[in-house]
UniProtKB/Swiss-Prot annotation:
[4Fe-4S] cluster 2 binds at residues 257, 260, 274. It comes from Klebsiella pneumoniae subsp. pneumoniae (strain ATCC 700721 / MGH 78578). The keyword DNA damage does not apply. InterPro entries: Aldolase_TIM (IPR013785), Elp3/MiaA/NifB-like_rSAM (IPR006638), MoaA (IPR013483), MoaA_NifB_PqqE_Fe-S-bd_CS (IPR000385), MoaA_twitch (IPR010505), MoCo_biosynth_MoaA/MoaC (IPR050105), rSAM (IPR007197). The gene is moaA. GTP binds at residues 17, 68, 99, 160, 262-264. This is GTP 3',8-cyclase. Binds 2 [4Fe-4S] clusters. Binds 1 [4Fe-4S] cluster coordinated with 3 cysteines and an exchangeable S-adenosyl-L-methionine and 1 [4Fe-4S] cluster coordinated with 3 cysteines and the GTP-derived substrate. Monomer and homodimer. Catalyzes the cyclization of GTP to (8S)-3',8-cyclo-7,8-dihydroguanosine 5'-triphosphate.
Amino acid sequence: MASQLTDAFARKFYYLRLSITDVCNFRCTYCLPNGYKPGAVNNNGFLSVDEVRRVTRAFSALGTEKVRLTGGEPSLRRDFTEIIAAVRENPAIRQIAVTTNGYRLARDVERWRDAGLTAINVSVDSLDARQFHAITGQDKFHQVMDGIDAAFAAGFDKVKVNTVLMRDVNHHQLDTFLAWIQPRRIQLRFIELMETGEGSDLFRRHHLSGMVLRDELLRRGWIHQIRQRSDGPAQVFCHPDYAGEIGLIMPYEKDFCATCNRLRVSSVGKLHLCLFGEGGVDLRDLMAEDRQQAALEARIAEALTHKKQTHFLHQGNTGITQNLSYIGG
């Protein structure tokens, strides 16, 4: 086995975010307000099941133990269950997660579980059905809520819910969210609105630092938890009176990048060292056959030597990320 992926700043990488499509059926104001427009896909289309199997096998040989399937909306893939099963074949991958808008969750969550899915993140930016519709462009709030209930019924011990924190949209609804998670094992993660190439105006209007919520949680007696090595970037808080937890993802906070442990592969097979980096390294030509695995591992390891110490969001440089559906946020 090759050595653990480590960059020039001694950061170790245990976590792969793998986009399997950039298509999404929602039109969220902060991501795809005008809906999905085909652009990134060439004649080869999105990664096949076999390509997913090969690239995750290569990453696991380099120490990856967690894979998150993202999009776009990953459940739009007709072969999504097969993709989960292909990743599950590899015993070195301990966690297989999905980030979904939740609209197919109630229908399919049991099949995903049986295929090997171990964790679920659902995007919910408001607990008000009308506001949910306004943000997403889809009147599917109750369908998504039913999906979260179905995930618990299917045996998932915890469900993570992602909420993009937006000034004058949902930042004043903390009490509503806290009441929702008090009896439920939901980790509610507030994600700071991030500037993208297509979203600069929205960012200027609605960005709010997660530190505002952090200070309020600490004032109310919430306790900051210790992070595990394959966890995502959230600072997680718990409270003895709540079954749920709160996570804060604050990419503009000082030293956010110091604990980076994740790499990204796009739905067309490009390795992205940072969500807000440039270009990407093409891996797809080395995913065609099993015998290419050593070369694929070598290209991944070499690419990591070029990973920067930090993103440049503070300078307004959003890199190649025009919207968050492109490489899965």
